[in-house]
Amino acid sequence: MRSISVLGATGSVGESAFDLLMGAGGPERFRTVALTGGANVARLAQMARALRAELAVTAWPERLADLRAALAGSGIEAAAGPQAVAEAAARPADWTLSAIVGAAGLPPGLEVLNRGGTLALANKETLVAAGPLVMARARETGARILPVDSEHSAIFQALHGENLDSVEHVTITASGGAFRDWPLERLARATVAEASRHPNWDMGQRITIDSASMFNKALEVIEAHEFFGLGVDRLRVLVHPQSIIHAMVTHRDGGSIAHLGAPDMRHAIGYALNWPARAALPVPALDLAALGSLTFAQPDEVRWPALRLAREAIGAGGAAGAVLNAAKEQALDDFIAGRIRFTDMAPAVEHALALAAREAGFAQSPRDLGEVLHWDDFARRAAAQWQGAA
């Protein structure tokens, strides 16, 4: 029986994974080693009971008593806190999904790699903040990383059997998010509620707002650079409102291989779960005739300056990815809390990058988790101080 763990089980990606696991046989087919989640301990306990997990962990220490109460009589072990999440990731499992949102996903992701496990990676921040460290650790231990972001899963599939040297460039598509068609002058007045409505994908609030600002795509460009080893000159972004083509690989002979699929995370999760095989998934096949047409446009970097910042971070190298990621998280926190405007997020991130570039050691890629966390803390403080946000 295959053993699995899901980190971030109660988020949108975790819910999709749970749906797939239960549909594929649940505890009759999988031995669930550990599930981790956040504040929603009632849902975490419900999932743990359904999958007969050995361990359930909430990242919130103050919710441990509630989790234990929800698991009473089940025989499932309960734990709490970030260290407990990392320890859960360190437990041997054949396949571990990392779906924790933000930089909090890095320590448990490294624990999976340290034990040489298979890491199905939906947490893009792991590679953005610590790409060289993460990829080196995987090589050292023989661990395998399978991309679960829909775009990177699409690239991974389109590259199957291909020589990377023959690739001219890779195109990642973007829906354009909630404000794709808004007049530029209106963006400064955008509310959190408006930014939280995605036209195509059903996702959590933070990633939906990141989609509206295009910071989600900026992180994905950096992630593709780190995972596939592609230079910034071989990475492109196209606005594709229908979210049907997730990525395209264009070869030097002029031909392109695209991956098409419904905007449903269950496809990428299911592909990673069953790789290298393919299995039937509860995702409807595309009806291209019903779709009628697919449209594309070049992204406007005045509207979406995050894309420029991603290219600059790749060019700078060193700690730039860690700084961009943490500054973005802080700016997003400040926007959600009403401390800054939607259009202030990119300037706050750019401010943090400019300050970090003056610091000793910025040009050096983080060599361990401690160095990643140093730059994470620096960037959050710098972004929070931008124009008085604190």
UniProtKB/Swiss-Prot annotation:
Pathway: Isoprenoid biosynthesis; isopentenyl diphosphate biosynthesis via DXP pathway; isopentenyl diphosphate from 1-deoxy-D-xylulose 5-phosphate: step 1/6. SUPFAM superfamilies: 1-deoxy-D-xylulose-5-phosphate reductoisomerase, C-terminal domain, Glyceraldehyde-3-phosphate dehydrogenase-like, C-terminal domain, NAD(P)-binding Rossmann-fold domains. Its cofactor is Mg(2+); Mn(2+). This is 1-deoxy-D-xylulose 5-phosphate reductoisomerase. It comes from Paracoccus denitrificans (strain Pd 1222). Belongs to the DXR family. It catalyses: 2-C-methyl-D-erythritol 4-phosphate + NADP(+) = 1-deoxy-D-xylulose 5-phosphate + NADPH + H(+). Keywords: Isoprene biosynthesis, Manganese, Metal-binding, NADP, Oxidoreductase. One of its GO terms (biological process) is isopentenyl diphosphate biosynthetic process, methylerythritol 4-phosphate pathway involved in terpenoid biosynthetic process. Catalyzes the NADPH-dependent rearrangement and reduction of 1-deoxy-D-xylulose-5-phosphate (DXP) to 2-C-methyl-D-erythritol 4-phosphate (MEP). It is an enzyme of class 1 (oxidoreductase). Its EC number is 1.1.1.267. NADPH binds at residues 10-13, 38, 40, 123, 125, 204.
